[in-house]
Amino acid sequence: MVNFDEEVFRAYYEHKIKSFIKEELSNNLIKGNIFEFDIEKFLMHFPDACEVNDLIIERPKEIEEIILDIFKEAYVELFGEDKELEKIQIAFKNPKGCEKLIEEISAEDINKLVKFEGNILQAGKVNALLKKAVYYCNKRIKDENGGFLCKYTYTPCDGRVEIEIDDYFSEGEFIKDMLSPREVKKILENKKVWDKLVEKGKIPRCVDLKENDEVFKENLKEIKFILDEYDSIYVNIQEMEIQQPIDLMKNPEEPARSIRVFLENTPGIYAGRVNVIGRVMKREYRHNIPIYKIYIKSNYIKISESYNKIEVKDILRNEELIETLNELGRKKNIIDILSNYLISQIKGYELVKKAIFLQQIKGAFKFLPDGTPLRRDSHILLITDPGIGKSTMLRRIARLFPQNAYASVTTATGGGLTAIVTREATEIGDGWVVKPGVFVRANEGTACIDELTVDKNVMKYILEAMESQTIHVNKGGINVKLPARCAVLAACNPKRGRFDRNLTVIEQIDIPAPLLSRFDLIFPLMDKPNRKSDEEIAEHILNTHIETATKDYKILGAIDIDGITVDEKLLKYYIIYARSCAYIEENQDLYLGEFDETKLIMPYLTDKAKKMIKKYYLEMRKLGEGDNPIPITARQLEAIIRIAEMHAKARLSDKVEDVDAEVAISIIDDCLKQVAYDPETGTLDLDKIAGTPKSRRDKMDAVLNIIREIVSLRDDGLAPEEEIYEKAMAIGLSEKDVNDALEYLKKAGDIYNPRYGFWGLL
């Protein structure tokens, strides 16, 4: 414990602290009712004041009170008196030496300042906290000058008592609307501020009774201190539970530890990875037993810089690393090589690997005139036979970056994937809390969703997340919009568990059309026996098992690309570099502070690439003229542009050239041919993905027209089923076509079946 003497502290540091505060105030560096005392910045001004940092960590409460007093003095000296000064609070920013993991916060940290990082596991609604209770004596009277006198002694006395609420649980229970003088004294003594207030003359005589104060003793029962709602100070407070991120766990196999945080002066924060600076507090856990729960009291919390931004700063500070990455980017077929290395556990499926690799790089930041961001993420769906390795791919990508997240629909709920508002017991009583799901946790990353088709109820939750990249929750007085700007990498098996070669791919995808159409790329991965590929896969699996059994596995896990050793770390650096900072203009130092990805130079479409994409789009659209099915829509055009941008960034180029457009078109074209091909017409039909192919719609229209024709000629307004079949087969429809059409038209509400063998129009 650092020794502390307030007088000595003030003698050494008061003038320095006041000088620093005045400079900050002159630059208008105050946020609402919070003044952020930036310790790092203070020490840059006064390098010989390192002890201030140590004292803030060891005795945050006492130092906070002193700095608040100094702040008020500095403010008055600069701007004069201001009633709003009473509402000001001090928040410590950038302390050094108190960084901890959540799992490291223990009993020895009680009453000390700590700094830690974590994910918001759940967050309650914002409530009002009585921060400073102001009481006035009911026996004070006004004098002729507008001041106050004691009713019994007629001596000046404003009868005011201020009680700061520091420990919500031990002090809050004594705060009532009305207190007796004895209760006031007991509270102030328990808070250990009695002597200081007596010394300053801020205790009314009826509270600080002397032996000769008979007049007060006689009337003590009549004297009450009434809580003044107008002069008392209330602040926002939010209770949240923050969990240690897996990437910061000493042992990722153990359950992640979490801690309760009470955040003051907050408008409300419900999701994200956050940095917290606060004081470790305790509250009674078992009545009459000295066992306590630990919680954090904080008024400083900040959304953490994403892993992406942190790594960008590391890259920008390392010229040698930048040179290596740029050299890698110039290598021939570098995208194919890194794509295979990214998912090296699986043999083959090069196009799928490339698409997933590009997905991690993301497209360019672009905004509409009203400021609405355009989606830069690519959504990918893998539909695979068993044994292909879809779960392996998803888990590999989920482990790639901290903001990537994995979930399997077999064990997840819709709310667990998006977000839920639920009623739970909290430290301050039962209340509604927001629990962010996988899509929110994967903000700025990739949400890897396995076994997508296991639970159909989950799919309706996923649709909004993919469509708007936000999650809306509105329940229990909580109405928030949570960010879910993530790419989606989903996987499932075909409807019957394995692909049926007698059916088209789209007929075997058990996903609602609105959700299916949100995927930019849909890859059917079939397990087709082939001697050559089977031999390669067997060799690959055997070699992998041999390598992982050796002591030099980590060395063997790296690959050599023309003299450059690429391991997992360098692969991540390359993706981050391509994603964010390959195109930073002249002064890189500008981005070492508050790094903003949206201000980076992003690749632009060259005329050649633009013409190539436009030509492909128009040629495909032309195939859909007349009664032909539509092979492509504007949604696929946007997907092509995104993928072309990703490919250009993967080459570390600031231009989307014809090679990028060619790759993007080939990937989209390959997916369309596998998924949207209609064997009946021999054409690509996007309506197959949307739900009903044109060929099927034409058959249903034909059956409906037949029913209309028959009904118009009959008095009972009903069409016999036999006659419907007879006329339908006459124009080339099969019995199955008619059965399917009747079933669909009935579900759609176009026809009804009043009695067996007859159909009528609705």
Curated annotation (Swiss-Prot):
Q: Which InterPro entries does the entry link to?
A: MCM, MCM_CS, MCM_dom, MCM_lid, NA-bd_OB-fold, P-loop_NTPase, WH-like_DNA-bd_sf
Annotated binding of ATP, by residue:
T384, D385, P386, G387, I388, G389, K390, S391
User: Where does the MCM domain start and stop, copy by copy?
Assistant: 334-542
Kindly list the residue ranges recorded as spanning the membrane: none
- The protein's superkingdom reads Archaea
* Keyword terms, alphabetized: ATP-binding, Cell cycle, DNA replication, DNA-binding, Nucleotide-binding, Transcription, Transcription regulation
**What PROSITE patterns does the record point to?**
MCM_1, MCM_2
The record, for CDD domains, names: MCM
Query: GO CC terms for this protein?
Result: MCM complex
For this UniProt entry, the molecular function terms from Gene Ontology, in alphabetical order, are: ATP binding; single-stranded DNA binding
Pfam families with a match to the protein in the record = MCM (PF00493), MCM_lid (PF17855)
The alphabetized list of GO BP terms reads: DNA replication
Q: Which family does it belong to?
A: Belongs to the MCM family.
- UniProt protein name: Uncharacterized MCM-type protein MJ0961
